[in-house]
Amino acid sequence: MKEQSERLTIGTFSAASFLNDLGSDMIFPVWPLFVTSVLGADMAILGLIEGLGDALVSLSQAGSGYLSDRIGQRKIFIWTGYTFASLSRVGYALSQVWQHLIPFKILDRSGKFRGAPRDAIIADISTDKNRGRNFGLLRAMDNLGAVCGIVACIFLFNYLGWTYNRIFLLASVPSLISALLVLMLIKERKVGAIYKGLSLKDLSGNLKLFLFLSAVFAFGAFSYSFLLVYAREFGFETGFVPLLYLAFTAVASVMSLPFGKLADKFGRRAIVVLSYSLFGLMCLGFIFVQSFEGVVALFVLYGLYRAAADPVQRAFVSELAPTRYRASILGAFQLIVGLCALPASLIAGILWETVEKSAPFLFSLSLTILAIVLMGFVKES
């Protein structure tokens, strides 16, 4: 019975993630083009909006992680987060200038507070032998939904001639279904009010170091939007740009579960180092790339990085964290990464506008190398 309940929980979260990303990625392939070409924002403004969104993701997850542990409830944060995502896309469809996007971006990204409580549930019902697989499966379903969303976007945009606004409205529906699935199928397991607070002395030196180096890496991990705009300015037609987004998302979808299994077999630290190395190689490639084929290959490399980094980092943090603080520390991890993401995308946009297109990649490469060096001092727990 317990095993059946755990399978239902993982299956429900996987289905909800699939549907939510289906909606999200009907928007993402054309989002930077919508913001810059239709609403008239420049690259610095795009970087500010993207960085603000990433920072809000982390702030919301840190808060929800703490509250989830404090009140002993997870489910309410999860279904509410999916509802926020649905409502925000209606707002995007109604926006007439880039300034209108900001409140709806805040609503959208603050809805990510579902992440830490959901990850805590998954970590709690998993074992050391299947934790990487479970997180990898969740990420694989995320990415599979993204692939389907991108295909839908390409079909609606390129072949049916749908406007951005109609696509955004349709994209609101899957996340609403995700909220209903969680409401109906996830049974709240009372975890109790676990603790009164969390301080640095509760964290091991190992965990503190990993959080620090994650911040270093995140400071250079700019938004995917820069890659899409780079491709357009490199010479790819506007209608082809979503296909590049599809390429890296499909790779991430296919490879997330294998990377999760590799992490179970060879350790989380090795796969985190591999993911950072893949990102560094991608940055190096964008500095020197001179062919269309090379750009496509670098998007594939970015997909491999996403497949390795996203699930394995969360699994690694959940193992380094004391069990009673797990949701809070997962939220704190997202907070640190997101607060660094705001200046990361903003700095990348400023470097792009004031220096040259290769400058953001060189900046990110330097920080990636530093993070890899620091990772050598983190011990597998």
Across the structure, where does each feature detected by a protein language model lie?
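Structural signature of the two symmetry-related core transmembrane helices
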Residues: I76-V90, S172, A270-G285, L365
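Cytoplasmic helix-loop-helix junction between adjacent transmembrane helices
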Residues: P103-L144, F316
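Central cavity-lining transmembrane alpha-helices of secondary-active solute carriers
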Residues: L48-Y66, L246-P258
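Helix-loop boundary and gating motifs at the non-cytosolic
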Residues: K2-V57, L207-L244
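C-terminal membrane-cytosol helix-exit motif in multi-pass small-molecule transporters
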Residues: S172-G192, A371-K379
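Hydrophobic core of transmembrane alpha-helices in multi-pass small-molecule transporters
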Residues: F18, S88-R89, Q99-R114, A215, ...
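A membrane-interface helix-boundary motif in multi-pass transporters
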Residues: F155-V173, I350-L367
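Helix-to-loop junctions at the C-terminal end of transmembrane segments
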Residues: S60-G72, F157, M255-G267, W352-E353
